[in-house]
């Protein structure tokens, strides 16, 4: 397992789609992680001050998006790992999963994100939730 510095087990979910944001938050909280939410990269700034262990971020939303969103987030919290999520991965439109990984994302997941895939990626990157 490749654990990170920051607040162990603390995750920031950034997505402008309230349904997807709440769904991923519910899955992560249900697994025992502490989760904060934001609607876009600009709204995430305060939460990034807490140095979460992981950010799960949509790639297409208002404000910085795509590789620019990854650069923005990594610039604010370089130690924080990032999972990029997008409905555009594999569609030929916008950022590809490879682009996201090249920009600094540790993992890239296509929407609709599956619960098992998200939880497996999170556990691999930051370990199990704190007891």
Language model: regions and residue ranges:
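Active-site residues of response regulator receiver
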Residues: 58, 86
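Acidic, metal-coordinating helix/loop segments flanking the phosphotransfer/catalytic sites
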Residues: 37-54, 96
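Short amphipathic alpha-helix used as the core "switch/output" element in two-component signaling
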Residues: 46, 67-79
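Acidic catalytic/metal-coordinating carboxylates
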Residues: 39-40, 64-68
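Receiver (REC) domain active-site loop signature in two-component systems and cognate sites
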Residues: 61
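Charged docking surfaces used in two-component/phosphorelay signaling
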Residues: 22-30
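Alpha4 helix (beta4-alpha4-beta5 surface) of REC/receiver domains from two-component response regulators
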Residues: 68, 89-109, 120
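Non-catalytic signal-transmission and effector/linker regions of two-component phosphorelay proteins
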Residues: 1-12, 114-131
């Amino acid at each position: 397992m490749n654990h990170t510095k920051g607040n162990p087990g603390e995750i920031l979910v950034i997505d402008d789609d309230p349904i997807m944001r709440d769904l991923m938050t519910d899955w992560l909280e249900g697994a025992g992680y502490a989760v904060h939410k934001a609607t876009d990269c600009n709204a995430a700034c305060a939460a990034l001050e807490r140095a979460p262990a992981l950010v799960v971020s949509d790639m297409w939303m208002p404000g910085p998006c795509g590789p620019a969103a990854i650069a923005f987030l990594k610039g604010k919290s370089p130690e924080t790992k990032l999972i990029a999520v997008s409905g555009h991965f594999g569609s030929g439109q916008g950022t590809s999963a490879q682009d996201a990984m090249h920009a600094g994302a540790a993992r890239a997941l296509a929407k609709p994100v599956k619960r098992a895939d998200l939880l497996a990626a999170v556990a691999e990157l930051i370990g199990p939730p704190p007891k």
